Amino acid sequence: MNPEVLRASLLAWYDDQARDLAWRVGPAGGRAGVRQDPYRVWLSEVMLQQTTVPHATPYFLKFTARWPTVTALAVEQDGEVMAAWAGLGYYARARNLLACARAVANDHGGVFPDTEAGLRGLPGLGPYTAAAVAAIAFDRPTNVVDGNVERVISRLFAVEAPLPDAKPELKRLAETLVRDERPGDWAQALMDLGATICKPKSPLCDRCPVAADCAALATGAPETYPRKTAKAVRPHRYGVAYVLTRGDQIALVRRPPKGLLGGMLALPTSDWRAGPFGDEEARASAPAHAAWRHVGEVEHGFTHFTLTLKLLRAEGAAEGVIWSPRRDLDGLPSVFLKAARAALNNLL
């Protein structure tokens, strides 16, 4: 492999085939002198953590329409941002987003630091996000390695060590390809190659601009890279969700500020535990005395466990809850929106 030939081939492909993304200034714009907006780059990178481009894009457009600058986002109420984030999942990202926006607004005059080290000093910015913003927004020669890049590098070099143990080696190998020339475009070219050509299960090797340099392709089985260890069985938890209505309103609660789905509006629930709840036990934990009916169950997958919620529904009053219109539930986290819709038989 000749690194300079590989870089030239991939950058030429990127110049012609770069994805058109809502937050991106493409190669043509860059050549015309259009600068990347650090706020948009940062926001997109946070949203894209554990989230696909098609799913994140409407949220990005909604956020930038409502909060066009980091300063505008910084002064917003926490609950408004958390509600706008609902459906993207991984809600700690939204809390970190606000903490970072406020640090930029209050401590940096509304201007993002323009170095990787400076960005690492902001709350909620890990090594990957800091490197990505530094490269894409400020053209700093940083080593930007996400899941797509790990896959590309593992195949280019036919790395035999399985993930996650291979991560340090993949990062080291990726670093050997970083140059001062076009570092932002280079980072995005690797990402685009992984997203559109070097796919996990069906790589389009016949369309790959760097196929001639791919050691995994030379083995005849590029789809077997990166190597992976067997996945552990994901634990299963159980709980009860209580759907209490009063006319056209539904009872909600705000979850504790720390922990899973912290600070979000939610249906009242029991604790979540390793075993299922019987009907009598489920009713005993209900938030109000009412004629509770078992109306079904929903299952939801979190990152580290699967949750099954038994659904109990009743009509009545309760103290210590927030009454919300049935038709205004889109701000709920996905698991509770799914539960509410199932319990109400989609008649919101």
Question: Residue spans of the language-model regions?
Answer:
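Intrinsically disordered, low-complexity, charged terminal extensions of DNA damage-control enzymes
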Residues: 1-26, 192-348
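Catalytic cores of DNA base-excision repair glycosylases
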Residues: 2, 8-9, 13-223, 236
